[in-house]
Every structure is written in structure tokens, then in C-alpha cells.
A protein has these predicted regions:
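Active-site-proximal loop/hinge segments that shape catalytic or ion-binding/gating pockets
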Residues: 1-38, 46-175
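Short, conserved catalytic/metal-binding motifs centered on acidic residues
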Residues: 43
Length: 175
């Protein structure tokens, strides 16, 4: 599988503000991971639509997806789901056990991420669609990981549980 683009999601109002100021996506402090990071989803957009809109905000909060070349973004950490949702226990699978985030961390190379997609999804298309596959040539450790990840496929969870999250410590400029 070839590397897919990285996608950063933001609201339209945040995008307009950034474009008027610096045209640079700057690392922001993450309380959960206690570091300044820029977050991306690997290969597909993933965001939650605000269902608690108590007024007409127009298009201010419409999602904007920025695409980045993976060769130009240094990976700090990679996880097979949205870490914020996991740590805030929005991902319902975490009710089955007190798993630490570290147990799910992927090696931070694009080669490893492509291997992960081949192992658990079979292809980039299946990954994009969120369709897991079960390969018969996986190791015991991979089977355990697959079972843990399979819990994340609960219908109670949204698309962020099937999307690889990548963080970087470096700013990303826009053309």
C-alpha cells in the first residue's frame, strides 16, 4: 500500500483565521498528551459534527479538511484511533478494560503504518471504508491487537475509532 495523504480537520472559522494570520498550522498544547502537537488523520477525514448547535452558526463551523504530503510531515506518534476520544473515554471499547494508550501506539514510520493497514484492513480502500479483514498469517501479538481493536468496532463508536491518528511536533505551512 502506498502512503496516503495526511488530513487535518478544522472549522471554517479557524481556517479563515489561520489563512488571514500566518498560513501555518502551528502545534497546539494537548492536555491529554501533555505536549505541543499538530494532529492529522491518515488517509481520510474524520470528524464529529456538532449536534448541539443551539442557534444558526451558518457555515462558521463547517468542516475544512487540509491535505498534506506524508513525506513532508515528521511523525511524532501514531495510533490506530483518535487518542482524545480514547483518553476521554468517548470510545466505548475502553469500558471493557483499562487499556493504556501506550498499548496501542504504532511505530512512527509510514512503512509501519502501511504494514498495519495491510495486516488489519488488507488494502487502502478497505481502510478508507473502515472494513477490517482477518488475515490467517498474523502472529499471536497481532491477534491480541486485532481482538482489542475489534472491540473498537462497536456501533456505539464513530468513524474516529477506525482512523489512524498521527501527531507531529512541527508546524506545517500552507501554500
Amino acid at each position: 500500500a502506498l502512503p496516503l495523504p495526511l488530513i487535518h480537520n478544522m472549522s471554517a472559522v479557524a481556517f479563515i483565521d489561520m489563512m488571514e494570520k500566518s498560513k501555518v498550522l502551528e502545534p497546539k498544547y494537548c492536555r491529554e498528551l501533555k505536549d505541543k502537537l499538530v494532529y492529522f488523520f491518515y488517509g481520510k477525514p474524520s470528524y464529529v459534527i456538532n449536534t448541539h448547535n443551539y442557534g444558526n452558526a451558518g457555515d462558521f463551523y463547517a468542516p475544512v479538511c487540509l491535505l498534506f504530503d506524508p513525506k513532508k510531515v515528521a511523525i511524532h506518534k501514531a495510533f490506530p484511533f483518535d487518542t482524545g476520544g480514547f483518553l476521554k473515554r468517548y470510545i466505548k471499547a475502553n469500558i471493557y478494560g483499562d487499556f493504556s494508550l501506550k498499548e496501542f501506539e504504532l511505530d512512527n514510520t509510514y512503512e509501519n503504518i502501511c504494514d498495519y493497514i495491510r495486516t488489519y484492513f488488507g488494502s487502502n480502500i478497505n481502510y478508507y471504508l473502515g472494513k477490517r479483514v482477518w488475515g490467517d498469517k498474523v502472529s499471536r501479538t497481532e491477534k491480541i491487537h486485532y481482538c482489542l481493536l475489534n472491540m473498537l468496532d462497536s456501533s456505539l463508536d464513530d468513524e474516529r475509532v477506525r482512523t489512524i491518528e498521527i501527531s507531529s511536533k512541527f508546524a506545517c505551512g500552507l501554500r
